[in-house]
Amino acid sequence: YTKKVTVPKKSKEFIDKNYSGTTANTTYWAPDLYYKEGDEYPYWFYLSTSCGLGGRNSVISLIKAKSPGLWDGEYADAGVVIASKENNNYNTNCIDANIFTDTDGKTYFIWGSFWKGIYMAELDTDTGLVKGIDYTSDATILSSGQKFGTRLFSTPSGVLGPEGPYTVYNKDTGYRYMFTSYGWLGTNYNLRVARTNKTFSEILSGSNPHK
């Protein structure tokens, strides 16, 4: 992105960074895209919003569109998916969404940044929202990121990472790889990877999901 935090609109040659404009203003960042085949609005964009760098007043929201260009065609605001507050005792931070569909067909919503680690919960692929959250209650939605989901891992101090999770499955190795960033936004910033040959449902049903 540019100096202003913006969401790249599209790029024919992403490796060469030939961006063709932006699709949102400075309030949205860390997007992830999920394609729901057969849906009226099949392109689901999960976007992060925070009240300042390093804060925990954060939300991940969902916008559904008919075109991958997002603002190029019709779109629908699906609202807040999950939210966190600055003064929460669990040091959670609801940004950096990642959507991953496992080999058993279950789809997961993965999030978390910088503070108390990376979290995971099952996604309802009919709505694009997270299973287990009462979306009929504004109060519940606004505190949904506090002590919700399963924490996969974090640093011992609870700060300086991990953040920015991104998960892929390699059918040749049979492993799921989760890439995350650690450290402060400086020379010690580094990228790490964790892997597992178990499905996430197997991990979440175990006694120690951190392994």
Question: What are these model-predicted stretches?
Answer:
Residues Y1-K211:
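Carbohydrate-active catalytic/glycan-binding domains of CAZyme proteins
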